[in-house]
Amino acid sequence: MTGSIAELIPAQERAIRLSPRDPQVGLFYFRIGFGHLLQSRTDAAIVWCEKARNATPAHPLFRTLLASAYALKGDSASAAAELAEARRLVGDDRYSSITRLRAVVSWGAPKDLVEATYFAGLRRAGVPETDAAAAGVGGGAGPTERQGAGNA
């Protein structure tokens, strides 16, 4: 994502208006939800992240953003369910720790906001800061390529 957070949401809303049946509409919803989460508007983030999940149910990153928002709202059961489904869908260990997730996802948003919202929510959802593989214990080489938010 590029540009300011203030520009993000209107740009995505415009894209949805121009192309409501776009095959990437789930990504537009995700970006709106992410923008709301970064601004600590958790209720709005949940609405848009649920739309993203419903539009693209097999996208694990959409589910982790929703898990984070649910956890920040205090809905630990929904957060745990979304996190478990994201882990099942992704097929690797990127959601095993905050450290591992940082290694594979590039957000293009201010790091302090991502820390205060997305990662804080994932911590509340039960994602540990590190794990044995992420810390280099047990021979895990770790991820080698970074993926953008649309591909994680």
Question: Residues of each region from the PLM?
Answer:
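Alpha-helical protein-protein interaction modules
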Residues: 1-152
